[in-house]
Amino acid sequence: MPYFIQRLFNTCKSSLSPNGPVSEEALDKVRNVLEKIKPSDVGLEQEAQLVRNWPGPGNERNGNHHSLPAIKYLQLHECDSFSIGIFCMPPGSIIPLHNHPGMTVLSKLVYGSMHVKSYDWAEPDQSELDDPLQARPAKLVKDIDMTSPSPATTLYPTTGGNIHCFKAITHCAIFDILSPPYSSTHGRHCNYFRKSPMLDLPGEIEVMNGEVISNVTWLEEYQPPDNFVIWRVPYRGPVIRK
C-alpha cells in the first residue's frame, strides 16, 4: 500500500522549504513519520531478505579491494525544497566521508547493519577558505555500529555530524531526506574528505569562542577513488502522487 510513502512525502512537502525545515517542530513531524518506515513501504522486501541469508563477515570484501561492491541509489523525489532517496549497500561497501553544506539531513536505516563515522567542523564559520584543499580541524561526533531498527538520525548544517561516512556490515539500506538538496547552482556541492597525512598538525586547538577542543581530526578535501561508483537504479516501490 502506498499509504506510508505518500504520507511521508506530504509531510515533507508541508514541512521543508528551499531554505530547509520551516521550523524544528516541522522537522519533528517528518522525523516521526520516517521512524515508522519498513522495507515493504518502499518496495525493498526482497532486498531486506538478503540480511537473513547473509553468511557472515568471512565473505566481506576489504574496502581497499580493487573492485568495491556496487552501491545502488534509488531516487524517489527531488525539488528545490528537499530530496528523498535510498542507498542500498552490499556488505563491505563504503560511502566515503562527505559533507552536506547548508543542509539538514534525516537518515533512517531501513534494514541491515552499518558502521557510521561522523564529524563536525571545529570552526564551522571558516567554510570559505582561501585554499579549499587545505586541512581543517574537525571534531568526532559519532563512531558506532548501527542495526535496524534504530532511531532516525538528524544532521544539521553545523552540528550533529554533518560530515559522515558509511561502511556496510551486512546488506543494508539507508533512507535519506535532504533539505534543501545538493545544488551546484546554489553552491551546495558534495565534497569528499579524508584524514590529512600531515604529521605536524596539532591534536588540540582553541577555537574562536575560547573553547579548547582535544583529539582533533584534520580533514582535507580529496577526490574519491575511481572504483567508488554509485549506480542510479529505478525506484519500484509504491507510487508517490505529487
Swiss-Prot record:
Its biological purpose: Catalyzes the oxidation of N-terminal cysteine residues (N-Cys), thus preparing the protein for N-end rule pathway-mediated proteasomal degradation, upstream of the N-end rule enzymes ATE1, ATE2 and PRT6. Controls the preparation of the group VII ethylene response factor (ERF-VII) proteins for degradation via the 26S proteasome N-end rule pathway. Acts as an oxygen sensor that controls the stability of ERF-VII proteins, which are stabilized in flooding-induced hypoxia, and regulate transcriptional adaptation to these adverse conditions.
EC annotation?
1.13.11.20
Q: What class of enzyme is it?
A: oxidoreductase
What is the UniProt remark on how the cofactor binds and its stoichiometry?
Binds 1 Fe(2+) cation per subunit.
Q: Which SUPFAM superfamilies match?
A: RmlC-like cupins
Query: Where does the UniProt annotation locate this protein?
Result: Nucleus; Cytoplasm
Q: A Gene Ontology molecular-function term? A: cysteine dioxygenase activity
Q: How activity varies with pH?
A: Optimum pH is 9.0 with CGGAIISDFIPPPR peptide as substrate.
| Residues that coordinate or bind Fe cation | H98, H100, H164
Effect listed in the UniProt record for changing Y182F: Reduces catalytic activity
Q: Per the record, what are the reactions this protein catalyses?
A: L-cysteine + O2 = 3-sulfino-L-alanine + H(+)
Native species of this protein? Arabidopsis thaliana (Mouse-ear cress)
Per UniProt, what does mutating H164A do? Abolishes catalytic activity
Instruction: Name the chain's protein.
Output: Plant cysteine oxidase 5
**Which family does the similarity line name?**
Belongs to the cysteine dioxygenase family.
Q: Which cofactor does it need?
A: Fe(2+)
GO biological process terms, semicolon-separated: cellular response to hypoxia; detection of hypoxia; peptidyl-cysteine oxidation
